[in-house]
């Protein structure tokens, strides 16, 4: 962790959850105290269908609400898409962009991610930008080159700590139960910090860097104590209040 940066624990529900799942969100909200938990911030990114109701649940809570993607246009003939403005109106303050599943399933390029980030900023949303290498790229020892290109292509000029969060999520670790070693994560996060600091100056020193990829209660302590890690992007473990709150409790003790 970087002690001067307030960490962020971000849950990503992905394409999971119905109205019944909001019970878990209520439990998460009940388990996070705004006075006690000033040592970190919490964010839950739910499916778009749940945003409005989730916003009602979290309206008086110390938890941020996020979307999972947005279009790069503010409106128009884009059937099935959702704009950043719509997310904002539904109660979101953040949006995940460039997630590995979007990059893989929909062939989203760095340029598309960059355009979406700009749309998020226009709407007043914080962009949580994901970058990460494939297993092949890791085996070919091109991880840092890949990440440098993704940072350059996906993060627009104007990134600041109040409008940008960057999550390192190695694609091969998403949903597999596998994670890099803490040494590998520290190396990568140190590299990312160097890159954003060089490009954005003082703001680059303050942008939060999250780790994402099979984060769960059993490995959270080791991951969150790793150098240059300012929080986590949590997938499956954010669907159950007990798991998410266990990770929050681990953070309280660090």
Curated annotation (Swiss-Prot):
Source organism of this protein record: Bartonella bacilliformis (strain ATCC 35685 / KC583 / Herrer 020/F12,63)
Signal peptide annotation: none
InterPro entries, per database record: Aldolase_TIM, TIM_sf, TrioseP_Isoase_bac/euk, Triosephosphate_isomerase
Family (UniProt): Belongs to the triosephosphate isomerase family.
Catalytic reaction(s) noted: D-glyceraldehyde 3-phosphate = dihydroxyacetone phosphate
Complexes and interactors: Homodimer.
Protein name: Triosephosphate isomerase
GO molecular function: triose-phosphate isomerase activity
Compartments (UniProt record): Cytoplasm
Assigned EC number: 5.3.1.1
SUPFAM superfamilies per record: Triosephosphate isomerase (TIM)
GO biological process: gluconeogenesis; glyceraldehyde-3-phosphate biosynthetic process; glycerol catabolic process; glycolytic process
Gene3D superfamilies: Aldolase class I
UniProt function note: Involved in the gluconeogenesis. Catalyzes stereospecifically the conversion of dihydroxyacetone phosphate (DHAP) to D-glyceraldehyde-3-phosphate (G3P).
Gene: tpiA
Keywords: Cytoplasm, Gluconeogenesis, Glycolysis, Isomerase
């Amino acid at each position: 962790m970087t002690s001067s940066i307030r960490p962020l624990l971000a849950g990503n529900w992905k394409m999971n959850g119905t109205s019944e799942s909001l019970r878990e969100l209520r439990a998460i909200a009940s388990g996070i105290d705004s006075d006690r938990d000033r040592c970190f911030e919490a964010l839950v990114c739910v499916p778009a269908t749940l945003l409005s109701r989730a916003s009602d649940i979290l309206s008086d809570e110390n938890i941020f609400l996020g979307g999972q993607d947005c279009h790069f246009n503010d409106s128009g003939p884009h059937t099935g898409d959702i704009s950043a403005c719509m997310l904002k109106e539904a109660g979101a303050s953040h949006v995940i962009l460039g997630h590995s599943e979007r990059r893989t399933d929909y062939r989203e390029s760095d340029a598309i991610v960059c355009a979406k980030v700009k749309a998020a900023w226009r709407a007043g949303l914080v962009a949580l930008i994901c970058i990460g290498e494939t297993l092949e790229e890791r085996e070919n020892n091109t991880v840092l080159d890949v990440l440098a290109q993704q940072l350059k292509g996906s993060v627009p000029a104007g990134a600041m700590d109040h409008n940008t969060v960057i999550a390192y999520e190695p694609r091969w670790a998403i949903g597999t139960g596998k994670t890099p070693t803490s040494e590998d994560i520290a190396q990568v996060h140190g590299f990312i910090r160097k890159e954003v600091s060089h490009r954005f100056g003082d703001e680059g020193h303050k942008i939060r860097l999250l780790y994402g990829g099979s984060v769960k209660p059993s490995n959270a302590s080791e991951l969150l104590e790793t150098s240059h890690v300012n929080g986590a992007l949590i997938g499956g473990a954010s669907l159950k209040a007990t798991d998410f709150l266990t990770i929050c409790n681990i953070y309280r003790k660090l």
